[in-house]
Design a protein with these regions (language model features):
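N-terminal domain-onset segments
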Residues: 1-83, 124-154
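Amphipathic protein-protein interaction modules
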Residues: 66-119
Length: 154
């Protein structure tokens, strides 16, 4: 109950919603379509669960907060543990921007964009390419290090 109240306050302060914005949906669908068939089906079942999109950093980092994730919907295999990033190149006119879909411990965790959400409003966006990006830089990794410190295993 408190989760819904908290999400309602975020909604009223324009920091989140219960639905994806068009550029978020385009990026997420492109990333999930890149996954092999069985993993794509599992990931799509995850995002069919009820969730709230919490947007941080001006909409650059939308994170999915699931209310009740079915434990049987975790992605298995190499993408089932740790952080993985599916890189989606978005074409907006002549510009190319790299967005990411973040998988964390087998769950579709959120998205990352290099520009604030307002940049994408009313923009004509196409998907250029999709690949799995295992680079160390991501907004999610920066936030994780800020909260938990640097992992001594790296």
């Amino acid at each position: 109950m408190l989760g819904y109240l908290s999400d309602g306050l975020r909604f009223l302060s324009f920091e989140g919603s219960w639905s994806l914005k068009p550029h978020e949906a385009l990026t997420l669908n492109a990333a999930l379509a890149w996954l092999p068939g069985d993993l794509e089906n599992t990931a799509r079942k995850q995002i069919a669960q009820r969730f709230f999109v919490e947007r941080m950093s001006g909409g650059r980092v939308p994170c999915f907060r699931y209310y009740r994730m079915d434990p049987g919907l975790k992605i298995e295999g190499p993408l089932g543990s740790g952080d993985h990033f599916i890189n989606v190149v978005l074409k907006i006119g002549r510009r190319r921007l790299n967005a990411k879909c973040v998988l964390h411990d087998g769950v579709v965790f959120g998205l990352e964009f290099p520009k604030p959400g307002s940049f994408f409003k009313n923009a004509d966006i196409e998907v250029g390419s999709v690949s799995c990006d295992e680079t160390a830089f991501s907004y999610t990794a920066v936030l994780d290090r800020a909260e938990h410190g640097i992992d001594s295993g790296d």
